[in-house]
Swiss-Prot record:
The keyword Transmembrane helix applies. This is Bestrophin homolog 12. It is found in: Cell membrane. Forms chloride channels.
Length: 434
C-alpha cells in the first residue's frame, strides 16, 4: 500500500519536517536502493584493492590510461539524465491513469439509491390498497454486490495481492460476494479465459430491464446505466494497461544504461594518482559518486515501482482495501435507513456569517475583531456649546483615549504596540456592525 506521509508536511516552517520525511524507512529511497548499493560498493572496493596491491607498476600505469580514456567518453556516450527524465515522465503519466481507473463505487451507489427507491403504497379513492409498498433494498444491495464481484474478477488478473486473496471461486464465496448458485453461471462462460468480469454486469442490466418494464413512468434508468457502465469501463481499462504495457525495449534501454554507467564508474572513479598523498576520500569512500548513485539509481527505482503499481511493493496500490471499502460503503448508501431525508428546517439565513474556532483564525481576522470590539466599547458624550440656545441641536463627540488610534494616527499607534495589521484603520463607525 502507498505509504502516507503528507501529515508530516503540514507545517513547512517547522525545522523537523525534513527529518521526518528523510527518516522514514518503509517505502523509502534507502530501502529500494540498499541491495544494489551494497553490491556496487563491494565491487568498487574490489577494483580498488586490485588496482592498488594486486598488479605491478607497469600494469597499473596501463590501467590508469585506460580508466582516463573511459572517463572522458563516459558522460558523452551514455546520456543518463535525458533518458531517465523522459522515461520517468512516461511512466508517471501511465501511473496516474492507472490510479484514476481504480474504481470507487460511491457514484454508482448513489445513483442506485436515488433512482431505484422502494415502491410506495397506492390507494384508491375509497382508501383501499391497490398497490402494496414494495421494499427494493434487497435489489439495491445485490446490485452493489455484483459491482464488487465484477471488480474482483477483473482486478485479480492484474493485481498480485488480489490474486493471492481471491485465487479461486471458493475464496470469493467465503467473503459473501459470490453465492453458490451463481458459481455455475460463471463457470459456463466460454470466454472466461479472456474476460469474466462482464457477467455480473449483465445480471445488473437484467435487473434494470425488469424495473423499467414495471415502472414505465420512471425515465431515470439511463442514469443508473451510465454510472454502472462507467464503473465497468475503469475495470476494463486496468486490464488493458496490464495487457499492453509500455514497450519492453524502452525500460530495457533505460535500466541497462544505468547499470552500464555505474559499471564503468567502478573504474573511472578510482583515484589514479599514486604519488599524491592519499586522503581519506581516496582510501575509504567515494562520496560524490555515492551521491550520484543514490539520486540516479533512486530515480530509476522509482520508475520501476511506477511501472507496475499493481505488484507487492510497499508503494503499490492496495486494491483489497478499495474493494472492501466499495462493498461496505456501497451497501450503506443503498440501505433504506440512509435514503430518507431528515426534516428540513431553515437554519441558515441571509445573515449567515462563517464561523471559525480561535485556533483556525488568521492574525488579520483576529486584529479586525479586536478593532471592532474597541470601537464598540468607545463612549459617546453629548457636547452643548454655551452659545447655543435650548432649541439648538446637540452635537455628539466620541470619547477616546489619549494614545488611541484615532488621536495618535496609525503609525504612532503601531509603534506604541497597537494593532499590528497596517491594513486595518477605521474610517467610520457605521461601517462596523454593532
Amino acid at each position: 500500500m502507498t505509504i502516507p506521509y503528507l501529515a508530516d508536511l503540514k507545517d513547512q516552517t517547522e525545522c523537523k519536517t525534513c527529518p521526518k520525511i528523510l527518516t522514514r524507512c518503509k517505502g523509502s529511497l534507502y530501502k529500494v536502493i540498499l541491495h544494489e548499493f551494497l553490491m556496487t560498493a563491494g565491487a568498487y572496493f574490489g577494483v580498488f584493492l586490485v588496482f592498488r596491491f594486486a598488479i605491478n607498476e607497469t600494469q597499473r600505469e596501463y590501467a590508469a590510461e585506460v580508466f582516463k580514456k573511459l572517463k572522458e567518453q563516459q558522460n558523452v556516450c551514455i546520456p543518463m539524465q535525458m533518458m531517465l527524465a523522459f522515461f520517468i515522465a512516461t511512466v508517471a503519466d501511465q501511473w496516474e491513469k492507472i490510479f484514476e481507473n481504480v474504481g470507487y463505487i460511491e457514484n454508482a451507489a448513489l445513483a442506485v439509491a436515488t433512482f431505484l427507491p422502494d415502491g410506495k403504497e397506492k390507494r384508491d379513492n375509497n382508501g383501499n390498497v391497490i398497490l402494496a409498498k414494495v421494499d427494493n433494498s434487497n435489489v439495491r444491495r445485490n446490485i452493489i454486490r455484483y459491482l464488487v464481484l465484477s471488480q474482483i474478477l477483473g482486478i485479480r488478473d492484474v493485481s498480485e495481492l488480489v490474486k493471492k486473496r481471491f485465487a479461486n471461486y471458493d475464496m470469493i464465496k467465503a467473503t459473501g460476494v459470490l453465492q453458490d448458485h451463481e458459481e455455475p453461471l460463471l463457470k459456463k462462460v466460454p470466454c472466461k479465459t479472456y474476460a469474466e468480469s462482464f457477467v455480473p454486469i449483465t445480471w445488473i442490466m437484467s435487473i434494470l430491464q425488469k424495473f423499467a418494464s414495471k415502472n414505465e413512468e420512471n425515465l431515470y434508468y439511463d442514469t443508473v446505466y451510465l454510472e454502472i457502465t462507467d464503473f465497468y469501463k475503469k475495470i476494463i481499462k486496468l486490464t488493458r494497461y496490464d495487457l499492453i504495457p509500455i514497450p519492453l525495449a524502452y525500460p530495457q534501454a533505460v535500466f541497462l544504461a544505468v547499470r552500464i554507467y555505474f559499471f564503468f564508474c567502478l573504474f573511472t572513479r578510482q583515484h589514479l594518482d599514486l604519488e599524491e598523498n592519499w586522503a581519506l576520500s581516496h582510501w575509504g569512500f567515494p562520496l560524490l559518486t555515492t551521491l550520484q548513485f543514490i539520486f540516479l539509481v533512486g530515480c530509476m527505482k522509482v520508475a520501476e515501482i511506477l511501472l507496475n503499481p499493481m505488484g507487492q511493493d510497499d508503494e503499490n496500490f492496495e486494491c483489497n482495501y478499495v474493494m472492501d471499502k466499495n462493498l461496505f460503503v456501497g451497501l450503506t448508501i443503498v440501505s433504506s435507513e440512509h435514503t430518507e431525508c431528515p426534516e428540513l428546517e431553515e437554519v441558515i439565513g441571509d445573515d449567515y456569517v462563517p464561523w471559525y474556532p480561535d485556533d483556525c483564525k488568521s492574525k488579520e481576522e483576529k486584529n479586525q475583531e479586536e478593532l471592532k470590539k474597541y470601537l464598540e466599547s468607545v463612549d459617546f458624550q453629548a457636547v452643548t456649546s454655551s452659545d447655543q440656545g435650548e432649541n439648538d441641536e446637540v452635537s455628539t463627540m466620541m470619547k477616546v483615549e489619549q494614545n488611541s488610534l484615532l488621536v495618535c494616527g496609525r503609525e504612532k499607534f503601531y509603534e506604541g504596540g497597537g494593532f499590528r495589521n497596517s491594513d486595518v484603520y477605521p474610517k467610520q463607525r457605521a461601517n462596523y456592525p454593532h
